[in-house]
Amino acid sequence: MSEEKKTEEEITREGNPRKPQGEEGKVMLDRMNHSHYEVTGWALAHWKIKGDDQILDIGCGGGMTLHRMTEQLTTGHATGVDYSGVSVEETGKLNEAFVKEGKLTVLEASVEKLPFKDDTFDKIITVESFYFWPDPQANLKEVHRVLKKGGTFLLVADVYQNGHLTEQQKKNITRYELFNPTEEEFREIFQIAGFAETVIHTRDGENWICVEGHK
C-alpha cells in the first residue's frame, strides 16, 4: 500500500507522529509525554517563566509541556493548539484542572493560520513538531506575528542536521519527509521570519537543539 493511500490512523500505527489519530494516536501521545520529557526540560531551562506570562504551545501533542509551564503561572494564561483532534482531547484530559481554573485553553488549530491577534503572547514554544510544518518559512512568520515585541519563541527538537545522525534517524527523516535544517539554516529562516535575534542551544552528546528567537 502506498503512503498516499494510507489513512491517518494507518500512518499513526506505523509510528509517524505527524498527526496522531484514533486509539493508537492516544497511545502514541502518552509515549511522547514521556519520551520528550527530558529534552523539553532542558529547553525550558533557557526560559524564565513569569507568573503573569501569556504562553502558547504550538503542536501541544499529549499536553505534558503545557502542564509543566502552566503550573508555574499565577495570573497568566497558557494556550495549546494542535491540528490533531485527538491531541486536543488528550491535552484537555491531562490538564483538566487547569482548564477548569481558567488558566489553560486548548484549541484545534494549525500553525498555518493561528487564531490570535498580533502581539498576543509573551512566550511561544513548539516541541518536536517543527519537522512537520507544511511551510516552515511562512509558518515562522505566523509565529512571529502573534508574539509580543520583546517576547521569545523556543523551537525544540531532539534531532537536527549536524553530521552526527544515526542511521535510524536518517531513515526516519527520509521516510516521514521531515524538515531538518542545520544550525545556519535555522538562523537564516528565523531572520527572514523577522526575529531580531536568534540564539541556538545544543547539548553535548545529544542531537538536541533549542532555537531561541527574540522579537
Language-model features: locations:
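Short glycine-dipeptide loop
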Residues: 52, 147-153
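C-terminal alpha-helical "lid/dimerization" subdomain adjacent to the S-adenosyl-L-methionine
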Residues: 6-33, 152-212
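A short SAM/SAH-binding and catalytic strip from SAM-dependent methyltransferases
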Residues: 123-135
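Short alpha-helical
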Residues: 38, 64, 85-86, 131, ...
